[in-house]
Amino acid sequence: MAEVANNEQQAPQFNIQRVYTKDVSFETPNSPAVFQKEWNPEVKLDLDTRSAKLADDVYEVVLSLTVTAQNGGETAFLCEVQQAGIFSIAGLTEPQLAHSLGAYCPNILFPYAREAVGSLVGRGTFPQLNLAPVNFDALFAQYVQQRQAAAAEEANA
């Protein structure tokens, strides 16, 4: 019986406690002049994630999106959204936990952030902006690779 209880404690657990908008900003520094120009924007998306341990097995993950639209060499709009979540995560190895915090949780948060960006852009009366899906697993793998390469370079120096 004690063996069964021990096995249950070791089973991975993942729960979403809360998803919330932590910070939001929308700027149209060149309005109303920007509305008088032909709309042919260059849109740039910057992503960032960070996580913090709040308590035993409880983590906050924040996904930051910054969308900048340039039209005719001027900033049409700048939209920043920080979408956050509180997650209970237990029973994972360190590499599994790092992957969960760096890829799995941001993947959960992204649709909320994408909707917030789309809503803000629409309220600014700009054409609809649909952000493409993001492969957070690939971004996390790239991040891990870069860290390993930097560590190897430091060891060889």
Swiss-Prot record:
PANTHER family in UniProt: PROTEIN-EXPORT PROTEIN SECB, PTHR36918
Stated name of the protein: Protein-export protein SecB
Q: Which gene encodes it?
A: secB
Which keywords does the record carry?
Chaperone, Cytoplasm, Protein transport, Translocation, Transport
| Function noted in UniProt | One of the proteins required for the normal export of preproteins out of the cell cytoplasm. It is a molecular chaperone that binds to a subset of precursor proteins, maintaining them in a translocation-competent state. It also specifically binds to its receptor SecA.
Please name the source species: Shewanella oneidensis (strain ATCC 700550 / JCM 31522 / CIP 106686 / LMG 19005 / NCIMB 14063 / MR-1)
Q: Tell me the InterPro entries matching this sequence.
A: SecB, SecB-like_sf
Q: Which Gene3D superfamilies match?
A: SecB-like
Query: Which terms under GO biological process does the entry name?
Result: protein folding; protein tetramerization; protein transport
- What superkingdom heads the lineage? Bacteria
Where is this gene product found?
A: Cytoplasm
GO CC annotations on file: cytoplasm
- What GO molecular function annotation could you give as one example from this UniProt entry? unfolded protein binding
Family per record: Belongs to the SecB family.
Quaternary structure note:
Homotetramer, a dimer of dimers. One homotetramer interacts with 1 SecA dimer.
